[in-house]
Structure formats: structure tokens, C-alpha cells
A protein has these predicted regions:
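Surface-exposed loop/linker segments characteristic of extracytoplasmic
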Residues: 1-197
């Protein structure tokens, strides 16, 4: 991976990091997933050099608040230009999510490797979705989809496990969390300085 080059090659050549982001990294994938190792290549996506991205089952915690216009959420741990250190995690590193399972994402696509929990107002489309069972415009805690066609998961936590989602906390421990965990508890676990202990 060459961090001084863009992830996608120019339209006319196959250079830069295209081959690298198509590499499947087995430890990035949950064995219980129900999808292939990499995004299928179709003529439309290949024309834009997007086919074949390798999937990832785990996503960094960006937090809960809606992002500012054109920006990303920044009350979590991992986000673009994040500089959150242990001293910034005032809710306690044993109570704060560092990263967790997602239904799918692409490790070579920066934002796809991140997740955000819905906000209380549910005023931002990425926050809400379909939980795989019932169409809803209410915040869903886990397993949310962008559309009822069940085709694409959009920037949230979830898993192919029946009842739980695995999370790594900032103290290095791992917890399996029930998919029915109260939304307010999950929201508190996704912020690094929300005064919830």
C-alpha cells in the first residue's frame, strides 16, 4: 500500500493502490459472514475501477452525532484525522467502543471501514434503515440497511450472528453485545466523552 497515492487508479491505467485494496485479508473477515471475500466485479463498476474491493467485517467507531455538512462524525474514536488519545476517553476505556462488527464494508475504502450509531433525532439518512425484518424510519441499533431490498449495509454495526455483535473496547477487551441492547446504552458506548459512566 502506497499512502502517497490515491486508492483508485486514473481512468486510463491500472496503477496506484488498486491491486492492494483487492487483496483479501482473512483476519479482517468474520467466519460467520454471508458474502464473498470481495465485491463482485461487474462491467459498470469495472469501468470506474471499483470492482473487486476486498471486504472487511469490522469497522472503527466514529461516534453518534450527525456529521457537519460535508464532514464526518467526530465524537467516537476512529475517524478521519482523529487524534483521540487515552486521556480523551473520559467515559472510561472499558466503556467505550473502539471498533465493532459491521454487515460489510471495504477495508480499502476509508469511510466504509467506519461505523456510526444513529442519533436521537434520526435526522440523517445514514442513521436509519431497515433492520432486516421491519422497514422503519426509527433509529435501529444493529443490522441496519440503507434500503428494504436488503442489498447494501450503510455505515452501521451489525453481524451475521443471530443474536449478538462483537465489539473491541478501548481497553483491548472484546465483548459480545446483544442486538436488543438499549439504544441509549449503545449510544453511550460509542462516545468517548459523553459523560456516561
Amino acid at each position: 500500500m502506497n499512502f502517497t497515492e490515491p486508492k483508485n487508479p486514473p481512468q486510463t491505467s491500472h496503477v496506484n493502490n488498486q491491486e492492494a485494496i483487492q487483496q483479501v485479508i482473512p483476519t479482517y473477515l468474520c467466519p460467520s459472514r454471508s458474502y464473498p471475500n470481495a465485491r463482485p466485479i461487474d462491467p459498470a463498476s469495472q469501468a470506474r475501477n471499483l470492482g473487486g474491493y476486498a471486504y472487511i467485517s469490522y469497522r472503527g467507531n466514529t461516534g453518534t452525532s450527525p456529521p457537519p455538512a460535508g464532514g464526518l462524525t467526530t465524537n467516537g474514536i476512529l475517524y478521519r484525522d482523529s487524534s483521540v488519545s487515552f486521556r480523551d476517553i473520559r467515559d472510561g476505556d472499558t466503556n467505550t467502543i473502539c471498533f465493532g462488527e459491521g454487515m460489510f464494508g471495504y477495508w480499502g475504502d476509508g469511510n466504509s471501514g467506519l461505523a456510526r450509531l444513529a442519533d436521537d433525532n434520526n435526522d440523517n439518512q445514514p442513521d436509519w434503515g431497515w433492520d432486516g425484518q421491519n422497514p422503519s424510519t426509527s433509529p435501529q441499533t444493529m443490522d441496519t440497511y440503507l434500503n428494504p431490498a436488503n442489498q447494501q449495509h450503510f455505515f452501521g454495526y451489525g453481524s451475521w450472528h443471530r443474536d449478538s455483535v462483537n465489539f473491541a473496547l478501548c481497553d483491548g477487551s472484546v465483548k459480545s453485545v446483544s442486538k436488543t441492547t438499549d439504544f441509549r446504552v449503545m449510544k453511550a458506548m460509542c462516545t468517548h466523552d459523553g459523560s456516561e459512566r
